[in-house]
């Protein structure tokens, strides 16, 4: 009975560890996607003088 308990604990730990790694990978992909989106907006904004004046932090 104790052996079954240890196997369940080990299996739970492995599943939890694998899920955490997958979550961090998806989170990194989402951040990279957000940075690409910001770069596109920066190019669009900096080409318009009114937007350039309103958002100098983007066009610096």
From Swiss-Prot:
Q: In which tissues is it expressed?
A: Expressed by the venom duct.
Q: What is known of its domains?
A: The cysteine framework is I (CC-C-C). Alpha4/7 pattern.
Source organism's superkingdom? Eukaryota
Q: List the disulfide bonds.
A: 45-51, 46-59
Protein family (similarity comment): Belongs to the conotoxin A superfamily.
Give the location in the cell. Secreted
The residues the entry assigns to the signal sequence are 1-16
Which parts of this chain are annotated as the region Ser-Xaa-Pro motif, crucial for potent interaction with nAChR?
Answer: 47-49
Species the sequence originates in: Conus ammiralis
Protein name listed in UniProt: Alpha-conotoxin-like 289
Q: Name one GO cellular component term.
A: host cell postsynaptic membrane
Q: Provide the alphabetized UniProt keywords.
A: Acetylcholine receptor inhibiting toxin, Amidation, Cleavage on pair of basic residues, Disulfide bond, Ion channel impairing toxin, Neurotoxin, Postsynaptic neurotoxin, Pyrrolidone carboxylic acid, Secreted, Signal, Toxin
Q: Which residues carry this modification: Cysteine amide?
A: 59
Modified residues annotated as Pyrrolidone carboxylic acid in this record: 43
Primary location recorded for the protein, binned into one broad class: secreted
- UniProt function note: Alpha-conotoxins act on postsynaptic membranes, they bind to the nicotinic acetylcholine receptors (nAChR) and thus inhibit them.
Molecular function as annotated in GO: acetylcholine receptor inhibitor activity; ion channel regulator activity; toxin activity
Q: Which InterPro entries match?
A: Conotoxin_a-typ, Conotoxin_a-typ_CS
Provide the propeptide boundaries.
17-42
């Amino acid at each position: 009975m104790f052996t079954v308990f240890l196997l369940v604990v080990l299996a739970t730990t492995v599943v939890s560890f694998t899920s955490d790694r997958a979550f961090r990978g998806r989170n990194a992909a989402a951040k990279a996607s957000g940075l690409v989106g910001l770069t596109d907006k920066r190019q669009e904004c900096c080409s318009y003088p009114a937007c350039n004046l309103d958002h100098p932090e983007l066009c610096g």
